[in-house]
Amino acid sequence: MAASTLYKSCLLQPKSGSTTRRLNPSLVNPLTNPTRVSVLGKSRRDVFAKASIEMAESNSIPSVVVNSSKQHGPIIVIDNYDSFTYNLCQYMGELGCHFEVYRNDELTVEELKKKNPRGVLISPGPGTPQDSGISLQTVLELGPLVPLFGVCMGLQCIGEAFGGKIVRSPFGVMHGKSSMVHYDEKGEEGLFSGLSNPFIVGRYHSLVIEKDTFPSDELEVTAWTEDGLVMAARHRKYKHIQGVQFHPESIITTEGKTIVRNFIKIVEKKESEKLT
């Protein structure tokens, strides 16, 4: 049975490149902070199995009733053991979003589907996509069904799941560094709607999706640095599958909360389409 706790995290939490444990949430008054975070007891399972998009489409999860906020499924946050996960959660809580957090080895994708999520957020984390538990399988099986947002390693999971290669950045480690990022969403509403172009982001990574092997038949680049590194991408067919290489929850990313808000808007738009 899942244990439930309420949290309050610090937006200014520094990030360690070697972090392998997430922040311990402190209990707060549920009357002042109604956001609920569900945390399952740890049980490690080997659940990764590469699945096809066609299989995901033929085994869709139940539809979400959207006429009452209490009837929404949660946005599921897959925590890849990163110290910034709860800063992302803090943004979602401040935006009035109901969500649940599970570590990447605490449940299977089938168990995740049964929670009827309205969206999925794959958090940053140490290591490579192969260290991300159910994240890769989640991209392939739930991505076609509900909006999916990958952050940092979450974007790398999207890239690898659809055939890209994850390599060390040719420009070295970026740890707490700011960069100017340019974007082009081709006039469509997306993660960067309403942002300055370019805008400033905070970066904490040493790996990137390799430009030469970028799976352009499946994905399209939506944002990049001035030196040409991929900073965001989305699926060509399932445009609600998208991710960013930088950290929107970092204080360096001055317009980061707008990006999280835009993800929630994408979730709401997807729900409204189910009613038409």
UniProtKB/Swiss-Prot annotation:
Recorded GO MF terms: anthranilate synthase activity
Protein species of origin: Arabidopsis thaliana
Subunit structure: Heterotetramer consisting of two non-identical subunits: a beta subunit and a large alpha subunit.
PANTHER family named among the record's database cross-references: MULTIFUNCTIONAL TRYPTOPHAN BIOSYNTHESIS PROTEIN, MULTIFUNCTIONAL TRYPTOPHAN BIOSYNTHESIS PROTEIN-RELATED
Keyword Repeat: no
Interval spanned by the transit peptide: 1-50
Annotated protein name in UniProt: Anthranilate synthase beta subunit 1, chloroplastic
Major localization listed first in the record, in broad terms: plastid
Effect listed in the UniProt record for changing G176E: In wei7-2; insensitive to inhibition of root elongation by ethylene
Catalytic activity, EC: 4.1.3.27
Enzymatic class: lyase
GN (gene name): ASB1
An individual GO BP term: regulation of auxin biosynthetic process
